[in-house]
UniProtKB/Swiss-Prot annotation:
The gene is ccmE. It is a single-pass type II membrane protein. GO terms for biological process: cytochrome complex assembly. It comes from Aeromonas salmonicida (strain A449). It is found in: Cell inner membrane. Residues 30-163 are periplasmic. Belongs to the CcmE/CycJ family. Heme chaperone required for the biogenesis of c-type cytochromes. Transiently binds heme delivered by CcmC and transfers the heme to apo-cytochromes in a process facilitated by CcmF and CcmH. Keywords: Cell inner membrane, Cell membrane, Cytochrome c-type biogenesis, Heme, Iron, Membrane, Metal-binding, Signal-anchor, Transmembrane, Transmembrane helix. This is Cytochrome c-type biogenesis protein CcmE. Residues 1-8 are cytoplasmic. The chain crosses the membrane at residues 9-29. It comes from the Bacteria. Pfam families: CcmE.
Amino acid sequence: MNPRRKKRLTIILAISAGLAAVIGLVLYALSQNIDLFYTPSELVEGKGPDKIKPEEGQRLRIGGLVVPGSVLRDQQSLKVAFKLVDNGGHLVTVEFDGILPDLFREGQGIVAQGTLKNATTVEAFEVLAKHDENYMPPEVADATNGMHFKPEYTEAQLKGAKQ
């Protein structure tokens, strides 16, 4: 092999190795930021035909309907815990430390983004509520198959909303 071809081959191999390293680093960085969507049933039973369950500490999004009567608020802080359900009937607890969206209601569809604390508990850092009476995020609509609770409010809740 003459020196010119040897130099050209060395340059091509160096560029290929650099490109492979960059692609590997980009894929590794992206894998750390992927948030997979789960329903409560998929979280408990596993997702797909292989019944793959997320690991504790994994980032994920979970969507379902807030179970009426399950919202527990800490009186000393902004911490809130509530349960989600889908048509599979499995319950998952979501813990959130922050201000819930104005449209958050019991019996309504939500999507929470956070990390898996244990098999049936998600520690959320973001909670998204549906937009109006008729809108439901597509993932939640598929998961619940129209299993929508009509919210029932007490007189105290209705008075509090008018003030």
